[in-house]
């Protein structure tokens, strides 16, 4: 392109490609029929995702990468909040017991049991989230089912 002339669309495309390159990423493109694209794009919008993000989620899921859905995230937050509450309750009971050692320990025992249950729930949830082999199998099953 000479000085003073206007850039062509191919010049702009080349300049954009040069600016967009980010280390560690690969650009993947695919051809979809109009109906496929419309259906896919509609589903992505219903979930509040861009087309690019929806494709990335699908690829990551097929590859077995970690994706946590909103329901799982809410369950985890609820368990963590429960653990925090139980921890405070146990500390208060222990403090009360230190002041008055004759009090009944049944309340402390019940809180400790609930605390253990919450930790077991959290452990189970984390194991299911972090199971790489299960995530890969789930993602590959989605891909195979689509074929």
Swiss-Prot record:
GO terms for molecular function: DNA binding; endonuclease activity. Signal peptide: none annotated. GO terms for biological process: import into nucleus. The keyword Cell division does not apply. Keywords: Crown gall tumor, Endonuclease, Hydrolase, Nuclease, Plasmid. NCBIfam families: PRK13858.1. Tumor formation by A.tumefaciens involves the transfer and integration of a defined segment (T-DNA) of Ti plasmid DNA into the plant nuclear genome. The virD operon encodes a site-specific endonuclease that cleaves at a unique site within both 24 bp direct repeats flanking the T-DNA. This is T-DNA border endonuclease VirD1. It comes from Agrobacterium fabrum (strain C58 / ATCC 33970) (Agrobacterium tumefaciens (strain C58)).
